A protein has these predicted regions:
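Conserved CoA-thioester-binding segment of acyl-CoA-metabolizing enzymes
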Residues: 2-73, 107-111
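Amphipathic alpha-helical segments at domain termini/boundaries
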Residues: 6-37, 136, 177, 184-215
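Short, histidine-centered active-site or binding-site loop motifs used for metal coordination
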Residues: 36-40, 93, 155
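Hydrophobic/aromatic residues within transmembrane alpha-helices
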Residues: 72-73, 85, 135, 194
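Glycine- (often His-adjacent) and acidic-residue-rich active-site loop
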Residues: 74-108, 127, 157-160
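Glycine-rich beta-to-alpha active-site loop
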Residues: 75, 106, 111-158, 162
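Hydrophobic/aromatic ligand-binding patch that stacks against planar heteroaromatic rings
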Residues: 111, 134, 169-170, 181, ...
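Hydrophobic, secondary-structure "cap" segments at the distal end of domains
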Residues: 167-177
């Protein structure tokens, strides 16, 4: 990370911090940073606890006239968002529960996609399943050209399909043929390939990811 960005982080004002989920909102010079750093876990996963926190953060960003845009970043060293909490999925015992879970994710990401202020997904590491669905709902996606950065919808390997809008947003982003290949195989897409196919807008070195995303 560059020295300039280190100074920016030190002078950021923390507006909100949820200790239970590890999600925080800070702002510097009109740019908000939404950081996800799930406690006691090597990766960030998505569960029913994070949705209400993201909703609060979206509302705060919408209402704060000093904020012009937002970055979505991970506090994990080599992982962005690794998808749904598998243990929570295993506790779903009925079609109605599964539908409610899916609809909740759809509503959250529809709101993210409709935000009047741009959200930039600053991706370093794995953006998998629901993590990629979140990235697709952001207006821009910037990723690091690094071996740890992979994007995929691996749910199919568990007998599932993306339930939070990924099956609609991915074809609009990369085209139907490429989207079907990802959705039906669950294959990992490396950073360079993701850029070539239009899945991300820009590739950068990890040390300047936040600088570029904040511009």
């Amino acid at each position: 990370m560059s020295d300039s960005r280190m100074r920016d982080l030190r002078t950021s004002v923390v507006l909100m911090e949820d200790a239970a989920t590890g999600i925080s909102l800070s702002v510097h010079d009109g740019v908000a940073t939404v950081r996800y750093d799930q406690p006691h876990s090597p990766v960030n996963t998505l569960n029913t606890r994070v949705g209400p926190v993201f909703e609060q953060i979206f509302s705060r960003i919408e209402q704060d006239t000093s904020i012009v845009g937002a970055l979505l970043v991970s506090g994990k060293p080599d992982s962005w968002i690794a998808g749904a909490d598998i243990d929570e999925l295993r506790r779903v015992t009925s079609p109605m529960e599964g539908e409610a879970l899916s609809r909740g994710g759809q509503q959250l990401l529809n709101r993210l996609a409709a935000m009047p202020k741009p959200f930039i997904a600053a991706i370093h590491g794995a953006a998998l399943g629901g993590g990629l669905e979140i990235a697709l709902a952001c207006r821009y996606r910037i990723a690091t050209n690094h071996s740890k950065t992979v994007l995929a919808l691996p749910e199919v390997q568990l007998g599932l399909l993306s339930g939070a809008g990924g099956t609609q947003r991915l074809p609009r982003t990369v085209g139907l043929r490429a989207a079907l290949d990802m959705i039906l195989t669950g294959k990992n897409i490396r950073a360079k390939k993701a850029w070539q196919m239009g899945l991300v807008h820009e590739l950068v070195h990890p040390s300047i990811l936040l600088d570029v995303a904040a511009q």
